[in-house]
Amino acid sequence: MSDKPYALISVSDKSQIESFAKGLIEAGYDLLSTGGTYRLLSDNGIAVTEVADYTGFAEMMDGRVKTLHPKIHGGILGRRGQDDAVMSEHGIRPIDLVVVNLYPFAQTVAKPDVTKADAIENIDIGGPTMVRSAAKNHEHVAIVTNPADYDVVLQELKDTGSISQKTRFDLAVKAFEHTAHYDGMIANFLGSRLESFEAPDSFARTFNVQLQKAQDLRYGENPHQKAAFYVEANGSGEGSISTAQQHQGKELSYNNIADTDAALECVKSFSESACVIVKHANPCGVAINADQTQAYKTAFSTDPESSFGGIIAFNRPLTKQTAQAIVDTQFAEVIIAPSLEQGVLDITAAKKNVRVLTCGELPSPDQRAAQFDYKRVTGGLLIQNQDLGLITADDLQVVTDLKPTAEQLNDLLFTWTVAKYVKSNAIVYGKDQRTIGIGAGQMSRVNSARIAAIKAEHANLATQGAVMASDAFFPFRDGIDNAAEVGIKAIIQPGGSIRDDETIAAANEHGIAMVFTGMRHFRH
C-alpha cells in the first residue's frame, strides 16, 4: 500500500477541478475519484483511480450507491495511530484529503417546472456523508467543499508540504456549515409541500435560514449592546445593503446599516431618478427629478434639520455635481448609490468621515422578487413576505364627487409610495413629485397629520394645494378636517374603515378629491 497521501475527489461543481487535481499531484498526492469527476480527470490525462476499482464494488442503482463503502469511510474516519491495525487488516488506505461539493439541489428546485422526482434525485446522500466524515476527523483529514479554497490549500501545500491543523479545522467548520445549509434547503422545500407538491405553502413546517457574518460591529443599537452584521447565504442578488461596497469613511455602525437599508429600500420603489434622505429609519425628505442634483436639493429642503447626519440614497449613479452639492450643503452619515461617476470620490474626500457606498444595479420596482422579512419577538420569529405591493392609477377607486387632476394623481401615487416606508401611523404631504411634510410614528393618525403640517411650515413649504397620503384608513373624519385646514386638495388612503362614509362625506364637504387603494402599508 502506497505511503503517498491520498485525495478523494467527487464534485458536482467542476470549476477549477482540473487545475486543482494537477496541483495535488505535484504536491505528491494520489487521486481517487467517482463517476463524472473521474471521467473528466482521466479524459484530461490526469492520473486517477476510480472508486469502484479501489473498493471492488461497482456503482449501482443509477449512481445512488458509489462511495457508501467501508473502504471509503474507513479511510476517511480512521484515526491515525489508533485505527491503523484495523485499516491494514481490511486493506483500507488512509484518505488524507476529501474534495466534495454536493448535487445542485437549489438550482434544480428553482426551476418552475421541477418535478418531485427531479427534486428527490438531486438530494445528495454520499456527498454529505463523506463531507461530515472528513469534517469529524479533521485532526487527520482535510475537507474542501468550495472551489474558492482550492488556491489556499495548494499554496499551503507548496509552502509547508502539508495542510495545517488550523486550516483543517477552518475547512471542517465550513464543511458543517455547507451541509447544514444544504439540509436546511431540502427541509424548507419539502416541508412547504406536505399538502401538495404542485401548490406549496409559503411557509414550511420548520424554517431554516443560514446567515454568514459579514462583519463585527463596534456595538449595537446602543453602546452597551454587542452586535455583528450577517447576510443571507443565498440572497436575492439585487443591489442592497448586504451587497454594498464601502469606498470611504468610517466603519459602518449598526444604526448606519439599518438606516441605509431603509433609505435604499425606499429609493428602489421609484422607477424615475429619485433621492431619499432617511433619519432613524424614517424618510425625512424624498423627491423625484430627472436632474439628480435637483432631486437631492429638493429632498433636503423638506426637512433640513432632520437631514443633518442622515442617510442619502439614490437609484441612479451618483454624479460629481450631486456629490459636490452634498459636500457643500450638509453632513451625512452615509451616501449610497448603484455606482459612482468617475471623480466622485475626489469630491467626497473633503468629508473623509462620510461613508460612501455603492450597492450595484437596482431592479425596476415591478421586477423585484419578494424576500422574507423577519421580526424577532421573545421566544420566536415573525416571518412575512416583503411588502412590495404596487399601486397604479388603474387600481385607484375615486370615492368623492371630485376627481383628482392628472397632476394630483401623480402626486398621490408618489406620496403613497413614500408612506409605505414611514413608520406608522404615517402621513405624507407632497406636491410636484416631492415631499413637503412627513408625520411619522404617532399613536394617533391625526397627530401624524398635524406633525406633517408643522414640518412643512417649519421648512417654509406651502401645504395649500398639496396632496396627502395615509398608510392606513382614517378611523374618524378628524383627519380629513385637519387636512382641509392646511389646504390639502387630494387624499390617498386604503379605505376599509367602518366610518368610510363619514370620511368621504367630510372630503366632499371640503371639496377634496379622495381615492382608496384597497391596500394598507403598516410599518412597525
UniProtKB/Swiss-Prot annotation:
One Gene Ontology cellular component: cytosol
GO biological process: one example: 'de novo' IMP biosynthetic process
Name of the molecule in the record: Bifunctional purine biosynthesis protein PurH
Domain description: The IMP cyclohydrolase activity resides in the N-terminal region.
Gene Ontology molecular functions: IMP cyclohydrolase activity; phosphoribosylaminoimidazolecarboxamide formyltransferase activity
Highest taxon of source: Bacteria
HAMAP family referenced in this protein's UniProt entry, alphabetically: PurH
Coiled-coil region(s): none
NCBIfam families registered for this protein in UniProt: PRK00881.1, purH
Catalysis: reaction(s): (6R)-10-formyltetrahydrofolate + 5-amino-1-(5-phospho-beta-D-ribosyl)imidazole-4-carboxamide = 5-formamido-1-(5-phospho-D-ribosyl)imidazole-4-carboxamide + (6S)-5,6,7,8-tetrahydrofolate; IMP + H2O = 5-formamido-1-(5-phospho-D-ribosyl)imidazole-4-carboxamide
SMART domains documented for this protein: AICARFT_IMPCHas (SM00798), MGS (SM00851)
Keywords: Hydrolase, Multifunctional enzyme, Purine biosynthesis, Transferase
Family: Belongs to the PurH family.
Protein species of origin: Psychrobacter sp. (strain PRwf-1)
Pfam families according to UniProt: AICARFT_IMPCHas, MGS
EC number: 2.1.2.3, 3.5.4.10
Domain annotation MGS-like: ranges: 1-145
